[in-house]
Amino acid sequence: MHNRSCQPSHPVAGGATGGYASVLFYMIYKQIIDKYYAQQPDLMHILMVHSEAVAQRALRICDAHPELGADRQFVYEAAMLHDIGIVQCDAPGICCHGTQPYICHGILGAKMLRAEGLEQHARVCERHTGAGLSADDIIRQQWPLPHLDFLPVSIEEQIICYADKFYSKSHIDREKTLAQAEKTIARFGQDSLERFLQWERRFE
């Protein structure tokens, strides 16, 4: 077991609005993560480092584009919890020793967060895989998911989904270039790539 600290340097990076609310939510999301990850410190470290990187990029997008009207506080909160479901998945390369297919981590995380009373955060979980997954994608690829659309709808969902594509949990110390992120998302199909490119034009 390692002694690396997995906590972000500040409860809400970049000074998100609402100091008291920020600290309060920091306590809440850490309690949620600890509830599921306390016995898996290596996986917790991967989750926290990845989530903080995604949150920071998402906040930079919010700051660069105030015209989007994104809820900065919610963006940070949801980014820190968007991958909570990986603990149930079978992906030993990133210390996940569960039983579920990795493609399911979004809907698994959504179920976990709904149980915690966090409906809006749950929607981010289930809509962030790839550039969102359509029912047609799921049927065509024969993924073990409900035949429903899991596509980012709100601006906050879109920002987090986009920011997430620049960071891999396999290499938590690296940030992908735009070209690398595009290559990753292209694996999900042309529709996903087109959504990503639209976000790229809007957010960069």
Regions found by a protein language model. Give the residues of each.
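Acidic/His-rich, divalent-metal-binding segments that scaffold phosphate/diphosphate chemistry
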Residues: 21-102
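Charged phosphate-binding loop/patch that engages nucleotide di/tri-phosphates or the phosphate backbone
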Residues: 185-204
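Residue-identity detector for glycine
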Residues: 14-19
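Divalent metal-dependent catalytic cores for phosphoryl transfer on phosphate-bearing substrates
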Residues: 67-174, 178
